[in-house]
UniProtKB/Swiss-Prot annotation:
InterPro entries: Holin (IPR006479). May be involved in the secretion of the autolysin blyA. The gene is bhlB. One of its GO terms (cellular component) is host cell membrane. It is a multi-pass membrane protein. It is found in: Host membrane. Keywords: Host membrane, Membrane, Transmembrane, Transmembrane helix. The chain crosses the membrane at residues 15-35, 45-65. The keyword Transmembrane applies. Its main location: host cell. The keyword Coiled coil does not apply. This is Protein bhlB. It comes from Bacillus phage SPbeta (Bacillus phage SPBc2). It comes from the Viruses. Belongs to the SPP1 holin family.
Length: 88
């Protein structure tokens, strides 16, 4: 029965069902998720830290690769630039 259904479709359908169930519970006045302000602040701090680490690491790595001749292609480019007197 489910052989022809994409895994992504199944995941999206399950998430939709959870979201709809949560909305029904909210409309009935039932708290589906008990979350306090401290939990939200902790989550925010964790996400901020993770984002800054990923951002700093990726931009640093990209800048380092971009500005240095460390790959095989980069080394060939450096040789060509030196040969044409275009290297600083």
């Amino acid at each position: 029965m489910f052989e022809n259904i994409d895994k992504g479709t199944i995941v999206r359908t399950l998430l939709l069902a959870i979201a709809l169930l949560n909305q029904i519970m909210v409309m009935l006045g039932k708290a589906a998720f008990i979350i306090n302000e401290e939990d939200i602040n902790h989550l925010y701090d964790c996400l901020y830290t993770i984002f800054t680490i990923v951002f700093t690491t990726s931009t640093t790595t990209a800048a380092w690769f971009k500005n240095n001749y460390i790959t095989a292609k980069g080394k060939k480019q450096k040789q060509v630039l030196k040969k044409e007197n275009l290297f600083k």
